[in-house]
Amino acid sequence: MKKRNIKLKCVSLAIAVCIFLTACSKEKESALKMYILPESISVADSGIVADNERLVMNWDTDQHCLYVSDKQTGKIWSSTPFDYYKSGDRTNDYTASGLCSSLYATYVNSEGLEQELNSYSDASYIQSVKIKNGIKLTYFFDEVQISIPVEYVLNSDGISASIDTSGITEGKNKLYAVEILPFFASVKNDSENMLFVPSGCGALMRADSGIRNVRTYSEPVYGEDAAFEKTYKTVNTESVHMPVFGIPGDKSGVLGIITSGEETAYIKATAGDEQYGNSAVWAQFRLRSKAIALVKDINNLNATVG
């Protein structure tokens, strides 16, 4: 895999979000550090971690929630939908694990099977250290021996999140994909609210719930890798021609722009999930590639190998 710099920038009337990810090259995969849980875990105090003329970034160390507020408009964008964060209700595990996770990850185990992680349910520890204009969080998934460091930095346009892949540690399980701030660009389920996805020249997904089933979207930026055999698609969608996504609104909204590394990215969205009560759109970055091959076993029967 070629070394890639992955950058995502989200622009809005109320706030802008910049997310930077760096993928590892194939030559450097062996140089990834082996997983070691540190003897002590640093924990930053809750409160303001950065501010400028326009924006303030806050960190809640108890609920592991990062949120940014606009001083002029009062608009708040949060890693956990802000109403849910303030409610303190965590009785539904499915809802809590989805909405309270600032990071999703997928890894491949020793048997070659993909497994999913979320920071709320699966992170044994989240180390938090204040840095210049922001905070560094390291997510330790001790059971599967994977750690992922992410730096969140406030800037004049909004917030950036960056992963230094040289800081990722692994054991026998291998990190495959990372999704940062999956509910930062989210809206309440309502027929008047919408998600913008870049299907073809662009499409809108209404965020209504109860009227129809949950709708999901997941498409690779610029289409599938031409080197791999195409898989059968059950939904008719157009290729993604522009690395963008967002939340439209009358007075404020979010526009996500992947400015580098878009060839590794997927745009994902979920609309109308009643248990979440929120609809969201975000980006996934795949740090490793995979392919599916059809082979024949000794009995001349077909078998699918990932």
Question: Can you annotate each of these PLM segments?
Answer:
Residues 31-42:
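Short, Gly/Pro- and small/polar-rich lid/capping loops
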Residues 49-306:
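Carbohydrate-recognition beta-sandwich/jelly-roll modules
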